From Swiss-Prot:
Upper classification of the organism: Archaea, Methanobacteriati, Methanobacteriota, Thermococci, Thermococcales
Quaternary organization: Heterodimer composed of a small WOR5-S subunit, with four [4Fe-4S] clusters, and a large WOR5-L subunit, containing the active site tungsto-bispyranopterin cofactor as well as another [4Fe-4S] cluster.
Reactions the enzyme catalyzes: an aliphatic sulfonate + 4 oxidized [4Fe-4S]-[ferredoxin] + 2 H2O = 4 reduced [4Fe-4S]-[ferredoxin] + a carboxylate + sulfite + 6 H(+); an aliphatic sulfonate + 2 oxidized [4Fe-4S]-[ferredoxin] + H2O = 2 reduced [4Fe-4S]-[ferredoxin] + an aldehyde + sulfite + 3 H(+); 2 oxidized [4Fe-4S]-[ferredoxin] + an aldehyde + H2O = 2 reduced [4Fe-4S]-[ferredoxin] + a carboxylate + 3 H(+); 4 oxidized [4Fe-4S]-[ferredoxin] + taurine + 2 H2O = 4 reduced [4Fe-4S]-[ferredoxin] + sulfite + glycine + 6 H(+)
Disulfides per UniProt: none
Gene from which the chain derives: wor5
Record's protein name: Aliphatic sulfonate oxidoreductase, WOR-like subunit
Length: 624
């Protein structure tokens, strides 16, 4: 076996037991790693009882996984997979963390975490030493405090144990903030103060297990690769291509804060009521001049250097620190809340990171609440204060209410979809039309109405990961621009921003590492399809509190059918009948039946005929 260690750690927090489990080459060939492998493990262990498994219950599994490209390809990501408390399906979430590299160097391809600890703990991994340790004194801490205490202590412990001279690279750590501890459904798993596995709500899953952090340090070599010379040749090509991404290196994704709204008319403004603006204050140049303290920051081994660090050195929010912010947070902590000033956006982004929340879903719920206040549906009495667009202090107050689950915050902590249902019930008025989500997951900060962005018509509507802008569907279903290719990147476990060499070349690189000899066509018609079909099945099984019906839920948010009210493409909006036709076309091409359910004969062809039992349960629930 090449590029893999061939084993996972299996950690039972309830029994306080740790063991190793083997991974067969056959399973790895079929599911690759990361998102694909995680989906398979969840299906095999929980598939027969999926609807009954509470994502925030002891029975759910939390998977931390690597892929075959981890440690070899430029940049560094780690995959987190579980049953999502947002969608009740499977979301493959990745974060910029060296944890995957450290695990691989310690001899593992990932970790299965099951059960629930009696009290707060953290997981410590140093090569073949694996310990479940008390974390009571760290519970309640945010990232900054954790780095000053827990990580510093463990770093010193390892340095002394190995008798290392100087200051060796610190261990990798992922952790949760108060949002995860209090099981806010859109809590993130954090690392390096400001990087997150946001989509999925896996910070809440980690919190439900009383797991504060996972720390790993490996000193062993990475697994051998199949063809080292070919790997080197391709790496040299890739480095040249990636190093040529000068605009990205210079400005990062934050360059989109102005251009996505002004040039593409697809940026969320005031809960997506608009998508065009011409406010230059949010220009990346203003962030550079007023907030940046570090212009080039990269994940381990990445030549792109797209990350920037903002720090407020003076003013009312002095001490706030954030990564630029990136485009998604500029939009969701900025324009979506009617805020365009860099300092205010940095402040709110800092709060989101310290509290351990997903910036996209947080900005989505804040914008939803603000629109309800704008329309008089939520009142000052409901909130305890006024919630006007552009008022960062009010949004900060609401953030704290959400994390502490106090007052209206208890409802909003359930996420936009569930909060919309509850508020509709309380107020006696349907507010779900103001909830901009797909299957419980907030859409990324890229609209579809203008058709000037990469997101189009059915990008979110039929994605197995709902509103996730990094896993969008497209026609043709088996083309190079849809969720099958994105499932490859998530299963290989690499960053979407280092895929410039292209799908075919990166597949070739994976083959040089693993020796699997996978073709692009094989991925699109077999391996990727197998992963997507299993994700689709688990999403439609859902439960225990929310279930999706593809006949009505394979659709865009109602807001996306409202004509754009301003900008160069004013009046533009998708046609509902056109969307329905494209959804049907997607079903046919991907291998679903006319109702959007994976066909049993396709499952047999993909070698997962066992999943027909789940399909039968879906059909029974939908009376089909």
């Amino acid at each position: 076996m090449y590029a893999y260690n061939g084993k996972l750690l299996d950690v039972d927090l309830t029994r306080e037991k740790v063991k190793e489990v083997e991974l067969s080459e056959d399973v790895l060939k079929k599911f690759y790693g990361g998102r694909g492998l995680g989906t398979y493990i969840l299906w095999k262990e929980l598939g027969e009882k999926w609807e009954k498994v509470d994502p925030l219950g002891e029975e759910n599994l939390l998977l931390i996984l690597t892929g075959p490209l981890t440690g070899y390809y430029p940049g560094m990501k780690t995959s987190i997979v579980s049953k999502s408390p947002e969608s009740n399906g499977v979301v493959g979430s990745v974060l910029s963390s060296e944890l995957g590299l450290e695990l691989k160097a310690a001899g593992y391809d990932g970790i299965i975490i099951r059960g629930k600890a009696k009290s707060p703990v953290y997981l410590f991994i140093h090569n073949d030493t694996v310990e479940i340790r008390d974390a009571t004194k760290y519970w309640g801490m945010g990232g900054i405090e954790l780095y000053k205490t827990l990580l510093k202590e463990v770093h010193e412990e390892i340095r002394k144990k190995e008798k290392l001279k100087g200051v060796p690279k610190e261990p990798a750590m992922i952790y949760i903030g108060k949002g995860g501890e209090n099981k806010v459904r859109f809590a993130a798993i954090m690392t390096k103060l400001m990087h997150a596995a946001g989509y999925g709500g896996y910070g809440a899953v980690m919190g439900s297990k009383n797991l504060k952090a996972v720390i790993a340090k490996g000193s062993g070599p990475l697994p051998e690769v199949y063809d080292k010379e070919k790997m080197k040749v391709l790496l040299r090509e890739f480095w040249k291509e990636l190093f040529s991404m000068t605009t990205f290196r210079e400005w990062g994704t934050g360059a989109g804060g102005y251009s996505v709204g002004h040039d593409r008319s697809s940026e969320p403004i005031r809960n997506w009521q608009e998508e065009y603006h011409d406010n230059e204050e949010i220009s990346v140049v203003n962030f550079e001049n007023r907030t940046w303290i570090k212009k080039y920051w990269a994940d381990y081994g990445c030549p792109v250097n797209c990350m920037k660090i903002s720090y407020l050195r003076y003013g009312p929010y002095k001490g706030s620190i954030s990564d630029a912010p990136d485009y998604e947070l500029q939009a969701y902590m900025g324009t979506n809340l009617g805020i365009f000033e860099p300092e205010k956006i940095v402040y709110l982004s800092y709060l989101v990171d310290e509290l351990g929340l997903d910036g996209i879903n947080t900005g989505n719920i804040l914008g939803f609440a603000a629109e309800l206040y704008q329309r008089g549906i939520l009142t000052k009495e409901d909130l305890g204060f006024e919630l006007n667009w552009g008022d960062e202090k009010a949004f900060a107050k609401l953030l704290h209410l959400i994390v502490e689950k106090e007052g209206i915050g208890k409802i909003l902590a359930e996420g936009t979809y569930r909060a919309a249902l509850k508020i509709s019930e309380i107020k006696g008025i349907d507010v779900t039309k103001y909830a901009v989500h797909v299957k419980g997951i907030a859409v990324g900060a890229h609209g579809i109405r203008s058709e000037l962005d990469y997101t189009k018509d059915i990008s979110y509507a039929v994605s197995v990961q709902g509103g996730d802008h990094t896993s969008t569907a497209a026609l043709p279903a088996k083309g190079y621009t849809g969720e099958l290719v994105e499932a490859f990147y998530d299963s290989a476990v690499i960053c979407n921003f280092v895929t410039k060499p292209g799908f075919e070349k990166i597949i070739e690189f994976g083959n040089a590492l693993s020796g699997f000899n996978i073709t692009p066509e094989q991925w699109l018609n077999e391996i990727g399809l197998r992963i997507i079909h299993l994700q689709r099945i688990l999403l439609l099984l859902g439960g225990p509190d929310v279930y999706w019906d593809p006949r009505k839920d394979d659709d865009n948010p109602p807001r996306f059918y409202e004509p754009l009210p301003s900008g160069p493409v004013k009046g533009k909006a998708p046609n509902r009948e056109d969307i329905k036709a494209k959804v049907k076309q997607y079903y046919e091409e991907i291998g679903y039946d006319e109702h959007g359910i994976p066909k049993e004969e396709v499952l047999e062809e993909l070698g997962i005929g066992e999943a027909k039992r789940e399909v039968k349960r879906i059909k029974k629930r939908l009376n089909l």
